[in-house]
Structures are given as structure tokens and as C-alpha cells.
Amino acid sequence: MDGESEVDFSSNSITPLWRRRSIPQPHQVLGRSKPRPQSYQSPNGLLITDFPVEDGGTLLAAQIPAQVPTASDSRTVHRSPLLLGAQRRAVANGGTASPEYRAASPRLRRPKSPKLPKAVPGGSPKSPANGAVTLPAPPPPPVLRPPRTPNAPAPCTPEEDLTGLTASPVPSPTANGLAANNDSPGSGSQSGRKAKDPERGLFPGPQKSSSEQKLPLQRLPSQENELLENPSVVLSTNSPAALKVGKQQIIPKSLASEIKISKSNNQNVEPHKRLLKVRSMVEGLGGPLGHAGEESEVDNDVDSPGSLRRGLRSTSYRRAVVSGFDFDSPTSSKKKNRMSQPVLKVVMEDKEKFSSLGRIKKKMLKGQGTFDGEENAVLYQNYKEKALDIDSDEESEPKEQKSDEKIVIHHKPLRSTWSQLSAVKRKGLSQTVSQEERKRQEAIFEVISSEHSYLLSLEILIRMFKNSKELSDTMTKTERHHLFSNITDVCEASKKFFIELEARHQNNIFIDDISDIVEKHTASTFDPYVKYCTNEVYQQRTLQKLLATNPSFKEVLSRIESHEDCRNLPMISFLILPMQRVTRLPLLMDTICQKTPKDSPKYEVCKRALKEVSKLVRLCNEGARKMERTEMMYTINSQLEFKIKPFPLVSSSRWLVKRGELTAYVEDTVLFSRRTSKQQVYFFLFNDVLIITKKKSEESYNVNDYSLRDQLLVESCDNEELNSSPGKNSSTMLYSRQSSASHLFTLTVLSNHANEKVEMLLGAETQSERARWITALGHSSGKPPADRTSLTQVEIVRSFTAKQPDELSLQVADVVLIYQRVSDGWYEGERLRDGERGWFPMECAKEITCQATIDKNVERMGRLLGLETNV
């Protein structure tokens, strides 16, 4: 068959490093004289001399020129194997390769032996001192014919996608006079053009091959000691390795190049600038596409220069996402078939650092006493009492274990519970006491641990902010007093309270009761809380003013907040802590009351303590509201200009309920016709009076009318009702033509400042704004109170700060009863812990669906509101 060869070796045990395509004719080989031994220098710098082998019928390798078939005219071009071994060799894809290219290719490289081994029985070669290799004549070997096996060379054609070499020795026929070091593939056509001076193996110059030429892959060793190396594996579409994965294409040859392939013809690129790299693109196989003995070399050359590296983006993404699999581990079986192994250890190190931080702190807390140091304590900003949790009565251990397996969305504070204390574990108290008593101990210990966290935050506020001379120099004494008020007195009161709580805990790890301590300090020590909460209005306004108008204050404040002791928390989060703490105390004490047996003497003491803390909360709320309302009244009164009979606005019993701008549709009579106009009005609604004004500027309003609140009637109206009404007037028609997007309602003033009845058609910008105005204006109407047991309950999952008087400020874990909801995203509700009503956005709340939890919340609200104090 054309293009095939019958290969004969001089010994069965010799591993040849060349390929045969055809058997040259006897007259072409035997009719030549023996030339002088040729010496040449290999590309790696080693001088090599080929000596003739004194054996009958054998020739030197240098005498047989290589015949290179060409596809254009089916002629053969004779080349010297020595020249091919020293120069770059042409391959089927039009590129060139040098003998040392196998060192860069993990699939084609083999280990080099330090010296030539001695002859062994069976016809192995022997290396004498002069460097000549004597090849004994073996018996005639069989002739290899197609179909080809993995041990036979495959012709390199453009249809094949992978080129390789054999891995097992093939016998060579000596009867035909072929040398063991010969490499002269034959062509299907005997006509050809011979090279000049074939005896010396010279070639005029490098032969440029086109992309259509079919060139066999020819390899010769660059050193003597490579004669016994095992050839690489044939990786072709017909090899067992390729057949193992089915009829998949490995890679196209056009991609196996170091240089960037452009759209233009690249055949003019210098051959020495191109390096062929063939590598399997198949990943995830059970084993590599080669022999086991070559696995180590495949791994060693993964990152060799010129190698084909693909999939870097996807690999780096997987490395950033998939954590826990070591891509760089030498034991990883997946590494052998990966195209690229980018080193991204930084991602894994950061993950280990931050993921282990919580576990380290948790272990430190579990094995220590109650409070061993501030470095392990949690600031009160990050502390969440279980008493505020709607599921606090349920077992939380399985829930915590389940949440650890998932991504934690909200910050989970690291703190100890009573069951986690080392003394409790050592004595086994959590297993010996009843479940109800254990929950009671947890509730008592939560008061102590939360007070410790709260005290720590107060000390940071005083040490880092209040006592900072640099910060004090940026503001006046009045501003500093409004900003920090009596925070030092509040901190001292908290310290006294905590000292007694901690002493009770140190006396006995099994705490009997703390209700007496809470009752005593609430009645006598916590008076500074009322003063501090009363100053809240001035505090907030002063801070906003300093941040807006004082750059030096803002710069120093930012520097202090970034200090590690402040843990990157803003100063405002420290300033509001006393208000947060005083409002949480009733819930903590109520939890203890629930866990205390009602027939026990401790229950009565606990109820008295709950009543005292509820009274404290009421005093703080009233003080804050009174100061805010009084200041607001004076501010508004100074901005009003009465064009009519003045109204005495300032009063200690009056406060602002809602304010805002609305669109009024007014009907005027001109001569014998009516005209409807649209104008903007600004309402100031107080708890007992409505002031109707027209806005002149941001701080100036002209009063047009006013009326007592009990003289107002409000009603909602829709577009359909207005258009279908038989008594539709011109103002309604004006609305239909010009303001179809507005949300309308009617306001009837039974008696205004002139004892006249006035009807107004008003429009709001949003549906929720209309609902809020209707609720505020009609709040005094005698409506029966809704049944709280039938109301929807929601839990606050995001804190919300009120920006208008009718809005409700909420903290995380607050429970609110919903009275009405608007489709554009607002709730009106009542806060469970103190009965305050107001509006807040839906996105801050999550509906409670568990009926048992709803019933418990209703019972708790009844207990808190039944203490004859507004908690």
C-alpha cells in the first residue's frame, strides 16, 4: 500500500526513535559506498559522531536521506536525518518543531538516562568505548501492515487531529540492509527530486511547506543516550486512548500553536518562532491518555512555555466559587487532565481566615467564664436578646445548627448563653434541671449578659468620643452638651446595676432570682435615663448640624469611628443605646415572668419589677415627646403669618400630628359663570386643630383658614364615583381633564374661623399619602376599636426611623399589629411593646403566620398594656 512501510530492526529489544513510511529499493541503498563518519552538534550543544556499524548488510544512518512526499506533484524530497535532527522539522499543520520540543510537551517527552546501559541477554545493544553501537542481527521479524495499532506510526494528514509517536519497540528487517538508525520514509511514487550531495547529508536550505503538504512527523535523538528511550504514545483518532472516549475530536491542529493565529496567512512566519504543542482537551476522564509511566512527566510540564492554556477564566471562577477542593494538590486525580492550573490561593486563604473567625471566637467563649474580657464581648449594637425573638420559647439548638450550614444573611452575634457556660457544663446543670427552669435561667442570664454588652458600648462612647479632646475642640460647649448630655451618669447607673447582677451570678451559677435587683435600681438608680431621653431631640439636631456645617468635626469623627475599638460603628449608634436599652427591659422582664411559676413567691416580685421598668419607659417616652413637641410648636408658630384672626398655637397639651402639601380644587364665581381653579395648600394638623396655609418659602407660610379638629369630616372618592355622580360639578370635571393621576378625597369643614361651612376637593400624589391624610384627619371620629386578636402581625426585619410625625420608628424584632395596608407599599400598625401607632414601609416587615406565636404575642401585649402604664 502506498505510504506504508515494512519495518525491520536488527534486534527485537532495541527501541528505535524513528519512523518508516516505505522500504527503499535495494538498488538505492546497497549500491552506495560508505562515507566518512559525520559529526554534528545537537541543538542542546552536544557534539555527536555517527560511526558505521560493522555488520553485514547494514549501513549508517547518515547514508539514507529522508524522502519527504509532497502532495502537489507526488515527488519525494530526500533529506538527511542528521539535518532533520539538528534543524527544525516540518509537521503536517505547516509548523516546525525541533528535537527539543518533546521536552516542552508532556505527552511526547521521555526521561533521559544518564548513560547507555550495557548489553543484556536477548539482543540488547552494547555501547563500546568508541561510542559505536553494534546491533546483532535478529531473526527476520514480521511485517507490519494496516490497520494500524497504537504501536505503529500513523501518517500525518490534515484529516487527523493529533500526532504522536509509538511507545513500544518495532522489529526492523535486516535482510534488506537497513540500518537501525535509518529514517527514510518512502513515497507512493518513486519519482522524486533528490537533494544535492546526499552522501554528506546536505540540503540547500529550509524547505517551506504549505498548509496542503502532507509531512510525516520525523524524530531523531539529539544525544546518544536517547537510543534506549521509550517513544511517546501515539495519540490519534485511531489509538485506544482516543477510542476510549468515543469518536470525540481532541483538538484542531490550528489551535496547537504558541503564536497568535490571525486571519491573514501565517505561512511566512519564521519556523524557529513557532512551537507545536499538542495536548488533550478532554477533562474529567478516569485516567490520562497515556501510559502510567508518563503521568509524572505530564504533570511536570503543565506550565511549560508555549503550552496551550485555555479555560483560564472559567477555571479562576470555579476556583473562586468552589472552596474546599485543592486544585494544586499533587494527589488530585483531576489535575492530570486539566488544561490550566491558575494559582489563586489568596481566595482560599481569605475564606479560611474569615470563615474560621466565628468558630475561633465561639470556642473561646464556650470554654471560659461569664465575662473574661472585652475582646471577646459583643457590643450592644450587635446584641440580639432572645426575648425579642418571636420563637424564643422554642428550642433553638437545632435551628442554630441548621443555619450554620447555610449562608448567614444577618449578623449572628457571638455570645454565651447560660447552657454554654463552662461551670454549667462541668456540673451538668442543663441536663439535671427541667426544661422550663432551664429557659428561666437562660432569660435571667440574658439580662446580665446584655447589660454587660450595653455597659461595654457605653464605656467606648465615653472614652473614644466624649473624652476626645480633639473632637471637643471642633465644637462649642453648648453643642457638646447637647450631643452627649448626661451620658456619664447613665453609664454610672448601668455600672451599679451590673455590679449587683454579676455578684448574684458569681454567688451561685444557678441564679435564684434577679427581680429584686431590677426593681430597686429601676425605682432609684435609673433616673438619668429620663433626662437623657428627654434631650434626644436636641441631640439629633445638633449632630445633623455639625455634620452638615463643620468639616473639621466630620473629619475627626470619621477618624475616631474607624478606630478598631469602635469596630467601625458610627457614633450615632452609640448615642441611641440608652433609648434602646430602656425599651427592651420590659420585654426581658416579661420573659422572666412567663418562665416563673405563678404560684411561686418569685412571681409577685417579678411582676413588680416589670411594672417599674414599664413606668420608666413611659417616663422616658413622655419626656422625649414633650421636649420634641414643645420645640416643634415654637418653631411652627414663628413661621406662620396670619392674614385672618390669629390663633394661639403654643400650648403644652398640643403637638403636631401631620404636615404636608396637597392640591386643592377651588370653584370661583365670576359674573354669571363658574370657574374651577387648582392651587396648592399646606396643612398643619395638630391633635386638636387644623391650620390651612399657603406656602411662601421653606420657612414661611400664610394662614388662610383654620378649624378645630372635631369639626372635620373626610371621605375618600374614586374616579369612577366622580364621573358617574349625577351632581358632578365643574371642579370634578376639571379634575377629570387635568389631574386624572391624582388620588382624591373630600374634606368638609363644618365650622371654620368665621363659623362657615367649607367643602374642599383635595388630591394627593400617591395612594398611600391619601390614606395617611384620611386616617389623620378622621382619627377623632368615633370608630369602635378593632379586635387585636384578629389583626395581622408582622415582625420587623429591618429598622426604620420615622421622618414624619405620623410615621412609626421601629427596631429589629419589634412586633406590630397591622390596621391597614396600602397597595403602594405602606402599613399602618400598632407597636406591640408600647401601643404606639404609625405608618412604616412594608419592606421592613415580615408577616407572622404561626398561630401559636400570634396568640403568645397577643397575651404579651395584654400583660404589658394591662400594667396601667403606656410601656
Curated annotation (Swiss-Prot):
GO biological process: endothelial cell morphogenesis; regulation of actin cytoskeleton organization; ruffle assembly
SH3 domain boundaries: 789-850
Gene Ontology cellular component list: cytosol; ruffle
Tissue specificity statement from the Swiss-Prot or TrEMBL entry: Isoform 1 is broadly expressed, with highest levels in liver (at protein level). Certain mRNA species appear to be specifically expressed in prostate and liver.
Chain positions with Phosphoserine modification: 22, 392
Domain PH: 655-782
SUPFAM superfamilies linked: DBL homology domain (DH-domain), PH domain-like, SH3-domain
Polar residues composition bias: residue spans: 173-192
Stored Pfam families: RhoGEF, SH3_1, SOS1_NGEF_PH
Residues of the DH domain: 439-623
Transmembrane intervals: none
Domain of life: Eukaryota
Name the UniProt record assigns to this protein: Rho guanine nucleotide exchange factor 26
The species this protein was found in: Homo sapiens (Human)
Gene name tied to this protein: ARHGEF26
